[in-house]
């Protein structure tokens, strides 16, 4: 019985082998036309493989140890851009979570006005959210905080102290330096803490039997008292987006309130940014306000200091990697504000590395692109240079700034003592010259520390 089963198995295996040989012979035979098609497919496969190998040779993973301090790619070509013949650097998968968070926060800041605009459009288009949007839009039209000094009431230390702003400053990183201690504007109330008391007493009605007699006592810090001068900080250079000014002054990422205790400062920016609902309130909470003259005067009258990016949009067009060109000769409005206010210190700030965070396209002085930029500036009050830097997942092209150190150095104050109702041009020019001289001192005394040795400060306009 066993022998017959073995014979059957051997016969079945033999039939299977014959079938495989037969099928292999059939598949192996081909006509001349089939051979031509196979050759073409093989040739295309080889070409695709060669192209893929060539592209992979140009692809490299970013190495932080060899890429330099700024985080720029070290490959050949303009900015390491593959489209221009250089190497294309992709982000490695193994990156610490803290660096991921830093990139996420910077991506939020650079595009937050877009996200807020999309959010507002979504809320307005969704009938389920009209219960919120209708009263908010009434409030938006009625409230004029960005234009009447109302930022002082909206100034939120809690929003400014969120942990995410430390990630923002660590990304570059941004560092805050002072040339000397500045006298505080606000000091604690000399009367100390204010005692507070709360009582609760219950009687059994209609009798006078006392059921409960509770007294709670505590102390509350009194509001600080304004005794010192106010400050008008001038921030230089503008760069593409005044990134250092936002991190160092509009947030507590660099511990502004500890480095300059008792000097709350409001960062002034274009009024256009306060026309976006919700985004406007977000900026006000951070202490950002309009750079309009009337508004700045209102803020100073309430003993809050302001920071003005003096060069503005015109200086942004001059931004280049390593550039030290400033627009300052014609910018005297902030000097006049100080004279009209009185008891104000003019303090220059220079941010080393501000112009190194983006690659900017040089449009020339006579090109159509430059004329278009100037038309945008004249019509809408702002303009944006054509720039690129890195992306979220690569290090060669995108709109995120490079990880380039920004060192924000605060200079010594130029004191304006008494208030002048109608300051003369001689007075304005006098204080302007003092301000420019102190700004040059800040640059010259610190340029060797922050990689600007051999460069000179250029005031071109």
From Swiss-Prot:
Keyword Endoplasmic reticulum part of the UniProt annotation: yes
Gene Ontology molecular function: 2-acylglycerol O-acyltransferase activity; diacylglycerol O-acyltransferase activity
Function: Catalyzes the terminal and only committed step in triacylglycerol (TAG) synthesis by using diacylglycerol (DAG) and fatty acyl-CoA as substrates. Required for storage lipid synthesis. Major DAG esterifying enzyme in stationary phase when TAG production is particularly active. Involved in lipid particle synthesis from the endoplasmic reticulum, promoting localized TAG production at discrete ER subdomains.
Transmembrane regions: 113-133, 231-251, 259-279, 333-353
Record's catalysed reaction(s): an acyl-CoA + a 1,2-diacyl-sn-glycerol = a triacyl-sn-glycerol + CoA; a 2-acylglycerol + an acyl-CoA = a 1,2-diacyl-sn-glycerol + CoA
Main enzyme class: transferase
Bilayer topology annotation: Multi-pass membrane protein
Region (Disordered): 1-38
Name of the protein this chain belongs to: Diacylglycerol O-acyltransferase 1
Signal peptide, first to last residue: none
Comp. bias regions, Polar residues: 21-33
Family the UniProt entry places it in: Belongs to the diacylglycerol acyltransferase family.
Lumenal side: 134-230, 280-332
């Amino acid at each position: 019985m066993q022998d017959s089963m073995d014979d059957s198995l051997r016969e079945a295996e033999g039939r299977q082998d014959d079938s495989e040989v037969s099928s292999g012979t059939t598949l192996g035979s081909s006509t001349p036309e089939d051979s031509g098609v196979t050759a073409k497919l093989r040739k295309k496969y080889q070409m695709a493989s060669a192209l893929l190998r060539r592209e992979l040779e140009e692809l490299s993973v970013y190495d932080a140890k060899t890429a330099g301090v700024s985080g720029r790619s070290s490959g050949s070509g303009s900015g390491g851009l593959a489209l221009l013949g250089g190497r294309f650097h992709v982000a490695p998968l193994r990156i610490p979570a803290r660096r991921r968070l830093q990139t996420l926060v910077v991506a939020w800041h650079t595009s937050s006005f877009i996200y807020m605009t999309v959010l507002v459009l979504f809320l307005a288009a969704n009938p389920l959210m009209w219960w919120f949007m209708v009263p908010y839009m009434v409030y938006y039209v009625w409230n004029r905080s960005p234009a009447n000094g109302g930022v002082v009431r909206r100034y939120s230390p809690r929003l400014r102290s969120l942990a995410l702003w430390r990630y923002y400053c660590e990304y570059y990183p941004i560092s805050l330096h002072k040339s000397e201690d500045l006298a505080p504007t606000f000091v604690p109330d000399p009367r100390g803490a204010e005692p507070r008391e709360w009582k609760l007493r219950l009687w059994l009605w209609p009798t006078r039997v006392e059921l409960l007699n509770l007294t709670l006592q505590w102390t509350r810090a009194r509001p600080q008292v304004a005794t010192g001068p106010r400050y008008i900080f001038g921030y230089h250079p503008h760069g593409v987006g005044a990134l250092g000014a936002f991190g160092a002054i509009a947030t507590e990422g660099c511990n502004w309130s500890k480095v300059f205790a008792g000097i709350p400062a409001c960062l002034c920016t274009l009024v256009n940014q306060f026309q976006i609902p919700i985004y406007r309130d977000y900026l006000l909470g951070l202490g950002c306000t309009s750079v309009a003259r009337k508004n700045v005067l209102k803020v100073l009258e309430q003993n809050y200091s302001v920071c003005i990016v003096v060069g503005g949009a015109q200086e942004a067009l001059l931004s280049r990697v390593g550039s030290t060109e400033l627009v300052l000769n014609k910018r005297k409005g902030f000097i006049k504000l100080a004279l009209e206010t009185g008891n104000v210190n003019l303090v220059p700030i220079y941010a080393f590395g501000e112009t190194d965070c983006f690659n900017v396209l040089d449009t020339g002085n006579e090109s159509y692109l430059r004329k278009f930029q100037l038309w945008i500036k004249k019509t809408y009050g702002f303009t944006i240079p054509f720039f690129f830097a890195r992306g979220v997942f690569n290090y060669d092209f995108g709109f995120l700034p490079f990880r380039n150190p920004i060192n924000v150095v605060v200079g010594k104050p130029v004191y304006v003592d008494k208030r002048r109702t109608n300051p003369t041009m001689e007075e304005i020019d006098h204080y302007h010259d003092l301000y420019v001289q102190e700004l040059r001192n800040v640059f010259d005394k610190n340029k060797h520390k922050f990689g600007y040795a051999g460069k000179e400060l250029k005031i071109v306009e």
